[in-house]
Amino acid sequence: MKSIEDILKDRKATAKDALEIFDLLEMVPVDFMIGRWKGFEIESNHQMDGLLAATGWYGKLFLNPEEVHPLLFYTKNLTELYSVNPRIIPMHMRFPKSGVVGILMRLAKPFLQTKKATARLRMIEYRNRVTATMCYDEKAILDHFAKIDENRVMGVMDLKGVSEPYIFILERDGDSDLKQNF
């Protein structure tokens, strides 16, 4: 089994290894997640591997348990962030993981952008333990979180209809000058 340090360094793991590490990490309460978080993907042979990076994904914003922006993206000039409504994105589709998808994302920004929070946080049991979980309002998706340290969590996205989880890391973003355009 890979260690969490190996996974963080390589940004790569099998779903089995990532879940074994997740099971060893401390579960987190909802209030631990409040704030803005910058994310990156852990390549695990999931159909979504590379997609968020190719589209300019930044991370997530947890304002409070009832108001969560699950998909924050960079603007073209990388100086601002905007929130995307996940309802519009077909999560089960296989997208090309190239610069083309990033261009398409920027062109579609006026249609995808939202000022509304589109998820919430709850304590939910996952893998026989209860942890803070982001519940999308209009998608059958749950993102479960486990604490790596005070400023990092591992996220496991459970997408209904997809057998393997999508793995990502969130790092607390307290010092960024990025403006939120929503």
Predicted regions and their residues:
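Soluble ligand-binding/transfer domains with enclosed cavities or grooves
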Residues: 1-182
